[in-house]
Amino acid sequence: MTATQKHNLFTPEPHYIPGYAGFYPQLRYQVGNTYGRTTAQLLTDPSVQKSPCSVLSPMTKPKFIEDFSKSKPPWIPCRDLREPYIPHYTSLKPYKNFEILGQLPRQDVDTQGPPQVENRQGPLTAGFMPYPPYPACPPGRKGEARDLGHPGLLLAYGEEAWKDAAPLQDTPGKNNQLYHCRRDEYLPPHPPQETLDVGRFQRLPQLDHPNLIQRKAISGYAGFVPRFAWVMGMNYRDGVTQAMDDFDKNQFVFRHPVCALGERLPRTHWPNTTIYRSQGLIPFYMGFIPSMQDNYALTFGNSTRRAYQKELDRRSHTL
């Protein structure tokens, strides 16, 4: 079956909807057609250059290029989402899991011998001490740390903790010496952690044109701003704010003219007098009508006529 053809009275596609206040090229030189037909001719004319980011909806049906036939790997949440700290925070985390910074892991101490001092700094000068002159810890057992709770309590209690501890039981093949952590001993660098991948939060479907969905909306306000002029070097937001402030000041002076005492107010004191008519206003007028809210049991036309009479009485008693 052939598709139904639209009548020539209808506006051809594509065209801009009336009321669009954006920019379109060469419209000022087209005469004799309606707004829709003129924009349709411009959009279909190959000689007119067009922006790749059009505000019109796509003419053709978008194609989904995402392949759903292949099985996807299980989604693994990013580590930054499981941590309570700020994402990408790599500084110090005090008392994290009650670990002492600079202490070798437990499995490394069990399997290896005394940690070799690895100096990663440059050559030391004469008289330089790589670590504070703390006395070396006396020998003890590994189980003493569990007896006293936190491993750092051994150093806090001092000699009494070592004297009260049970005697050593040497085990062949293992070295139970506790070593003091020096500042010139460094742990191996941690493997790089997984960073936050912003792309995994993208929920938009993959189309043949990336910005196809965003093209349906007109970005930015392109309407009329009173007393607004393009000034070189001024931001749009600042220009609109300055224009609206200037407009408010102008309206205040226009509605409150300066006149001497005893003089009659000029006609500009009532700039919106066109809404007051003896015939009354037509229905569905959505503007503001002063003193109309005090009228009851009247139609819209009679209420506006009553407001017109009240306005005449008010002006007659005004200088």
UniProtKB/Swiss-Prot annotation:
Oligomeric form and interacting partners? Microtubule inner protein component of sperm flagellar doublet microtubules.
| Listed InterPro entries | CIMIP2A, CMI2A-C-like_dom
State the gene name recorded for this protein. Cimip2a
State any GO BP term from the record.
flagellated sperm motility
Keyword entries, A-Z: Cell projection, Cilium, Cytoplasm, Cytoskeleton, Flagellum
Family to which the UniProt record says this protein belongs: Belongs to the CIMIP2 family.
- Quote the cellular component terms of the Gene Ontology held in the record: axonemal A tubule inner sheath; ciliary basal body; sperm flagellum
What is the official name of this protein in its record? Ciliary microtubule inner protein 2A
- Organism lineage: Eukaryota, Metazoa, Chordata, Craniata, Vertebrata
Role according to the record: Microtubule inner protein (MIP) part of the dynein-decorated doublet microtubules (DMTs) in flagellum axoneme. Binds to the intra-tubulin interfaces.
* Domain of life of the organism encoding this protein: Eukaryota
Q: Where in the cell is it found?
A: Cytoplasm, Cytoskeleton, Flagellum axoneme
For this UniProt entry, what is the primary localization, expressed as one broad class?
A: cytoplasm
